[in-house]
Every structure is written in C-alpha cells, then in structure tokens.
Amino acid sequence: MRSLQTVSRGEGPSFISHTGIAAPFLRPNVDTDIIMPLNGRLALMGRESLSEGERCFEPIRYLADGSENPAFILNQEPYRTASILLAGDNFGTGSSRESAATGLRDFGFRSIIAPSFGEIFYNNCFANGVLPVVLDAEVIQHMADQVARNPEVETKVDLEENHIRRPGLAAVSFSLDARLRNKLLLGLRDLDEILRYRGEADVFLEGDQVRRPWVYNWH
C-alpha cells in the first residue's frame, strides 16, 4: 500500500484538520431540496445573483418575503459563522445535485457530522473538500448539548488523527474508508486518483497484450 508521504498531492480541495464554531441542527431527513433548491423563491424575487452559500438552506433560512427566519439556527449568533455542522439522521438524502455539497462549502462548512448521509451527497462532499463524519446519534446529541451550553467554544475535527476534540469533552474517534480519507488529505480529484495508477495500468496492458494478443488484434 502506498504511504501518504510517497504520493504527490492533487489540485483538489484538501482537509487535514479544522477548528471552528459548531452548529447543532439535528433535524432528520434534511434533503438536497432543502440544502440547495433548484428554483428557490429568492430567484423568483429577482435575487439570482446570490452565491450558493447565501442560498444554502433557503427554504428554512428565509421567510416568504425574503427576510431571514430568526428561528433558524444559522441566522443566530454565533452560528452565523459556523464551519462545523452537527446534523440529523439521513442528512443530504434526495437528488444527486452536487450544489448541495458546494453550497455548504460556500457557506463556510468544512465538516458535517451526522448519524448517516445520503450516499451520493456523502461522496460529493469528498470531491469538494467537505469532511462528512458518521457518529452515533447519541454521541452527536451529547456534543450538541455541550455546544448549546457553550456555543462560542470551538470544536476541532482532525482527519490526520481521526478525532474530534472540544474542551470539556473526551476526544471522539471516527473511522473512514482509507481511499476517501487519503483523497481528502491529499486533495485528490477523481482524475488524480486514476492517474496515480497509470504506471500499474501500463504494466498490466503490456503483459496482457502478450497473454491475450487476440483481444488487441480485432481490426
């Protein structure tokens, strides 16, 4: 297996560790239509120039007249500047739109922590420099309770150590598929991952042409 030290970095967004404000938003089944609607009311109101980050969570972030919904957690201090989201079960379910992941990144989120994720959304996060972490619901609830008591205390998500740390709480460990972990640590895009194995592919092709020449003599 290749070590991180021997593999060159890619040109994609990477994630090693991040420290920031965590926001507790434990609503279950938040789908991509809520995270990033395709045709939201703000666009109908002539506000098409808003960034993805400004449109993120539009259906629950804004009221019918386009003003902020004061009850929404991310419209409250200090969560306006949150960069870590404590989310509910099945976060990011629904359609495959990549803008759900890029919108969260544009808002400022670097890590989403939830009991489970929509599969396509989960993979889109890795492609866009956002770290999705799966933890038990009870652990997330405990973290959310602690955040609510001390909202301005920052949380650290460390991908190198596979730990989440916060003052007053014991370190929480998490596991991640090795390929996806390396992809974020090294900032590898899909093409970067493929090209890492180009040498092995060339060696295989040369040997296979000797073993099965009839496969390559079809013209």
Predicted regions and their residues:
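Cytosolic catalytic domains that perform sulfur/thiol-centered chemistry
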Residues: M1-G88, G92-H219
